[in-house]
Regions:
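N-terminal auxiliary segments of SAM/dcSAM-dependent transferases
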Residues: 1-54
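Class I SAM-dependent methyltransferase Rossmann-like catalytic core
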Residues: 55-79
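Conserved alpha-helix/loop element of class I SAM-dependent methyltransferases that forms part
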Residues: 71-96
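Conserved class I S-adenosyl-L-methionine
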Residues: 96-107
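Conserved SAM-binding loop of SAM-dependent methyltransferases across substrates and taxa
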Residues: 108-120
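Conserved SAM/SAH-binding beta-strand->alpha-helix loop
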Residues: 128-132
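Conserved SAM-binding strand-loop segment of SAM-dependent methyltransferases
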Residues: 142-153
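A short acidic, Gly/Pro-enriched loop at the edge of an enzyme's catalytic core
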Residues: 152-164
Length: 164
């Protein structure tokens, strides 16, 4: 949900902070840029002329989700979750602040959702270039905010805003 992670996000044009407007139907930057939130719950944060690449199409995203649901990658998701937990355990995080996680190339949110299930109160930002993947990502977990962005450009993330 974008309202849970908006403080992590940044305007892709100039890095200024974003805030929700019009009941979070838009995100607006301090410098006046505005980004519409899709009805499916994700936001596209692209600078200038927009995204240069399209990412996975709907068939590719559906095929990936079907394959992941078969459990073939269960050992990998367990390893990723364990590594994130170890990293957070060794970090000096304030106990009163929930951990903030970022997954770049998040796809449908398979890894991020599983990791959030294992880390109480943590919140996550999933970035992917595919709007089709972002539709799934936005629904994968109640503590995930889904963002369509080109990771070859400036990440739309505030400096020092994520823990893992």
């Amino acid at each position: 949900m974008l309202s849970h992670i908006v403080d992590i996000l940044a305007d892709p044009n100039d890095g200024t902070a974003l805030s929700g407007a019009d009941d979070f139907s838009r995100l607006v930057s301090e410098s006046g840029h505005s980004y519409d939130v899709a009805k499916q719950g994700y936001v596209t944060l692209a600078a200038g002329a927009g995204l240069k690449h399209k990412g996975d199409d709907m068939d590719m995203v559906n095929a990936r989700e079907t394959y992941l649901a078969m459990g073939h990658f269960a050992p990998f998701v367990e390893a990723v979750t364990g590594a994130v937990q170890d990293g957070l355990d060794s970090a000096s995080l304030a106990e009163s602040t929930p951990a903030s996680l970022l997954e770049v190339g998040a796809g449908t949110g398979y890894y991020l959702a599983h990791t959030l299930d294992s880390i109480a109160e943590a919140r996550g930002v999933g970035l992917d270039i595919s709007p089709h993947a972002a539709k799934h990502l936005a629904k994968c977990h109640p503590r995930v905010g889904a963002v369509v962005a080109d990771v070859w450009e400036r990440l739309p993330i505030q400096d020092e805003s994520v823990d893992a």
